[in-house]
Amino acid sequence: MYNLQEITEKARKAIDALQDNSIESLEAIRVEYFGKKGHFTQLMQGLRDVSAEERPAVGAKINEAKQKVQAILNAKKVEWEEIALNERLAQERIDVSLPGRKMELGGLHPVSITINRVVQFFSKLGFTVEIGPEIETDYYNFDALNIPKHHPARADHDTFWFDAERLLRTQTSGVQIRTMEKMCPPIRIMAPGKVYRNDYDQTHTPMFHQIELLYVDKKANFTELKGLLHDFLRAFFEEDLQVRFRPSYFPFTEPSAEVDVMGKNGKWLEVLGCGMVHPNVLRNVGIDPNEYSGFAVGMGVERLTMLRYNVTDLRSFFENDLRFLKQFK
C-alpha cells in the first residue's frame, strides 16, 4: 500500500507542477498513470498475486486512488479549457457599436407584381378570381370556345398534346367555360394562370401567364367593355394613355378587337385582345344568347410587365438573374 500512496502522491504533484496550460501535457500524465502500461494499470494487474481474502480490499483501495487522481486530472482539464476559452473570447471580442449584417429580403417576381395589380383593380369592380386545370381537354380548350376540329385557328396555338383528347392549355379561356357551366348570370370573373405554347424566342416562351376576364349579364355591351379597358390601362400604367381599338378576329368573340396604347416613342403597342362573347359559346354552356350577352378580355401578363417596366427580352422573367429581379423590389 505504500507503493499505492507513493504513486498517488507522485501523480498529484505532477499535475500540480504543470504550468503550460497544455491539454497535451495532461494527456501525457493520463497515459503515464492510466494507459496500458501505466502505474495504476500495473497495480491492478498485480492483484493476481494478492491472496483471495485480501484481494477485494486491496482492489477497492486501488480504485479509490485511481478515482482521486482522475478527479484531479478532470478538474485541471476543465480549468485549462475555461482559461483557453476566455483567452479566445478576449481575442474575438465583438464591437457592439458596429452595424449588424442586414438580412437580405426577397421580393415579388415582376410577373406576380403585375398579376396582383390586375387582380386588385378588377376586384374593386366586383370581379372574382376563378382557376382551372392546366392539363385541359380538347373540349374546354377548343370545342366549347367555337374552335372545332380542323378549324384553322387551332394551328395558331402551337399546342402541346398528351394524346388526342388531353393537352397543356393554350389559353385560360377554358376557365370561362367551366365557370359558365356551374354559375348562372350575372357573371364577373377573372382567370389568371399559366398557359403553354410550343414557341421560344425573344418575345415568346413555352410557358407564360394570361389573365382573362368574363362578364355576362342581360345588358353587357361593347361600350361598357371599352370604358372598362380605358380605365384599367390608365390605372395600370399610371398615365393618361391614348388607347385605340382595332377590329380583329377571335373564334370565341364577335365582334372582336385588339387594344393598343401609344408608346413613348410615338408608336402603337398592342396590349390585349377582347370582344363580345360569341353566341355559340353561350349556347355551348346552356346560356340563351337572346337573353344574355357578355364580353371577354385576354391579356398576356408578361406583355403588360414588359411594357410597364421597359423590359426588352421576355426570357429575362424566367432566367432567375438576381441582377434583373432586384430591380423590382
Swiss-Prot record:
One of its GO terms (biological process) is phenylalanyl-tRNA aminoacylation. Binds 2 magnesium ions per tetramer. Keywords: Aminoacyl-tRNA synthetase, ATP-binding, Cytoplasm, Ligase, Magnesium, Metal-binding, Nucleotide-binding, Protein biosynthesis. Mg(2+) binds at residue 254. GO terms for cellular component: cytoplasm. Its main location: cytoplasm. Pfam families: Phe_tRNA-synt_N, tRNA-synt_2d. InterPro entries: aa-tRNA-synth_II, aa-tRNA-synth_II/BPL/LPL, Phe-tRNA-synth_IIc_asu, Phe-tRNA_ligase_II_N, Phe_tRNA_ligase_alpha1_bac, Phenylalanyl-tRNA_Synthase, tRNA-bd_arm. It catalyses: tRNA(Phe) + L-phenylalanine + ATP = L-phenylalanyl-tRNA(Phe) + AMP + diphosphate + H(+). GO terms for molecular function: ATP binding; magnesium ion binding; phenylalanine-tRNA ligase activity; tRNA binding. It is found in: Cytoplasm. Its EC number is 6.1.1.20. It is an enzyme of class 6 (ligase). Its cofactor is Mg(2+). Transmembrane segments: none annotated. Tetramer of two alpha and two beta subunits. Belongs to the class-II aminoacyl-tRNA synthetase family. Phe-tRNA synthetase alpha subunit type 1 subfamily. This is Phenylalanine--tRNA ligase alpha subunit. The lineage of its organism: Bacteria, Pseudomonadati, Pseudomonadota, Gammaproteobacteria, Pasteurellales. The gene is pheS.
